[in-house]
């Protein structure tokens, strides 16, 4: 029943895995090695929620950024640019929940 993936990125690398995929929701895991970044992007028709599960990430949202340490939750409203960066020395992990899926329910 546990779908949490085993991700182990090197420094500067970002590893991802789809954890849950249904007709109306996507949960994806992101493991950021030290120095890695998830480039800012947006989802015009979907809400995105980050759940920081391990370590500390710098969350980027439009022109703002904030350090979020596990356990932490960050809401990204529809159409709001968002991303994440690992400024630390250890791997950081977050999941991102996206719903509804673009073109989905």
Where in this protein do the model-derived segments appear?
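A generic "binding-loop/recognition-motif" signal
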Residues: 25, 34, 45, 64, ...
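Short acidic-glycine-tyrosine-enriched beta hairpin
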Residues: 63-79
């Amino acid at each position: 029943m546990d779908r949490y993936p085993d991700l182990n990125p090197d420094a500067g690398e970002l590893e991802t895995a789809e954890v849950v995929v249904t007709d109306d929701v996507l949960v994806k895991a992101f493991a950021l090695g030290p120095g890695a970044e998830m480039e800012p992007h947006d989802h015009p028709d979907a809400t995105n929620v980050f759940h920081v599960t391990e370590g500390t990430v710098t969350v980027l949202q439009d022109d703002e950024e904030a350090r979020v340490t596990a356990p932490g939750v960050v809401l990204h409203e529809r159409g709001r640019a968002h991303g994440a960066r690992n400024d630390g020395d250890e791997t950081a992990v977050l999941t991102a929940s996206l719903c509804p899926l673009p073109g989905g329910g």
